């Protein structure tokens, strides 16, 4: 079968590898769709992550497909089911798992980051990580359940109040998901800052009340222009250091700043502690998707969340190395690899 195999920084190869054998509690999935995530970009760029990605690993952790084989102990799905995958396999017995914060599991296995993932034609997955969905939902939509689950965890931590004001910095896929979730949480005003015009237009279509071009408009002035007196929640989804610093500056009194965008491990920001003290700002961060995957999938299936509009385009597996190597292409929008 064809697979995208990572070897080292800037070295991802499309190769023929054997179809994996499954154990008693695993399923074999014919992968149909796998999204390119920011984590994939960081791995390709050689950045250190939460766990090292071994040479020879097949990347891809946002994927869906069809079950073609099941182990004898599998009870949750059947051959022919359409499924998507939660890529974070927890051990269940470390202190973090037993303490109810399993996303910090000391023995976590990352499908597509530490073991083979979805950028391959066939993938073996433990039954505990597989979620069936109706065949009326496209494989591309279902592959978006993983990033939605991550966003749900972040929004849960923001404590967005009904009638409040939310500012989202960054209008890529994550920012556009956050925009919709903030609206569903009851925010009366959601502002979104994004330099690319097409993404601002899409943000307005998805419900943004205020859109801001940060290259040509002053963020604080634009908010004042729309009579925004206090921003209660700021969600930084761009992963840029300057955006995190700006989030702290524009945050209102007694507000929450969610640092959601992924930065490089060795990057630092300049923060004025007095500003945080004076405004009683709460700084928060969000790590992967503990216990939110089912909710994410249900929101996609119910149509409460539009995940199709933010897909920039689909591509073949053979195009993947070129997309990862092209920073301009990477920034254009969300890619889904079809297999």
Cite the ranges covered by each PLM segment:
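NAD(P)H dinucleotide-binding glycine-rich loop of Rossmann-like/cofactor-binding domains
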Residues: 91-169
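Residues in the short beta-alpha loop(s) of Rossmann-like NAD(P)-binding domains
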Residues: 195-196, 263, 289
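Mid-domain Rossmann-like dinucleotide-binding core that forms the NAD(H)/NADP(H) cofactor-binding site
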Residues: 137-216, 221
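C-terminal hydrophobic helical "lid"/dimerization subdomain
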Residues: 241, 245-249, 290-339
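Glycine-rich cofactor phosphate-binding loops and adjacent beta1-alpha1 units
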Residues: 158, 201, 205-280
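Short Gly/Pro-enriched turn/cap motifs at secondary-structure boundaries
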Residues: 7, 18-19, 54-60, 111-115
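Glycine-rich beta-strand-centered segment in the early N-terminal region that forms part
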Residues: 20-34, 48-95, 134-136
């Amino acid at each position: 079968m064809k697979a995208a195999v990572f070897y080292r920084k800037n070295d991802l190869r499309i190769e023929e590898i054997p179809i994996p054998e499954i154990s008693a509690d695993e399923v074999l999935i014919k992968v149909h769709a796998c999204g390119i995530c920011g984590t994939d970009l960081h791995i390709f760029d050689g950045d250190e992550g939460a766990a090292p990605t071994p040479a020879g690993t097949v990347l891809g952790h946002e994927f869906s497909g069809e079950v073609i084989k099941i182990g004898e102990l599998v009870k949750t799905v059947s051959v022919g089911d359409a499924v998507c995958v939660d890529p974070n396999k927890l051990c269940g017995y470390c202190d973090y798992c037993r303490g109810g914060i399993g996303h910090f599991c000391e023995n976590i296995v990352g499908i597509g980051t530490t073991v083979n993932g979805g950028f391959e034609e066939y993938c073996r997955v433990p039954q505990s990580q597989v979620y069936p969905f109706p065949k009326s939902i496209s494989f591309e939509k279902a592959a978006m359940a993983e990033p939605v689950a991550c966003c749900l965890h972040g929004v849960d931590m923001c404590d967005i109040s009904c009638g409040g004001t939310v500012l989202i910095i960054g209008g890529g896929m994550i920012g556009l998901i956050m925009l919709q979730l903030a609206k569903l949480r009851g925010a009366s005003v959601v502002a979104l800052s994004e330099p690319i015009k097409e993404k601002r237009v899409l943000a307005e279509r998805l419900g943004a009340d205020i859109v801001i071009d940060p290259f040509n408009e002053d963020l604080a002035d634009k908010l004042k222009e729309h009579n925004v007196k206090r921003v209660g929640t700021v969600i930084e989804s761009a992963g840029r250091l300057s955006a995190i610093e700006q989030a702290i500056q524009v945050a209102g009194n007694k507000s929450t700043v969610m640092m959601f965008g992924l930065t490089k491990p060795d990057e630092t920001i300049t923060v004025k502690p007095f500003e945080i003290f004076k405004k009683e700002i709460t700084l928060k961060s969000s790590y992967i998707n503990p216990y939110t995957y089912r909710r994410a999938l249900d929101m996609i299936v119910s149509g409460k969340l539009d995940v199709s509009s933010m897909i920039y385009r689909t591509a073949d597996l053979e195009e993947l190395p070129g997309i990862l190597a092209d920073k301009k292409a990477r920034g254009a929008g969300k890619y889904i690899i079809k297999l």
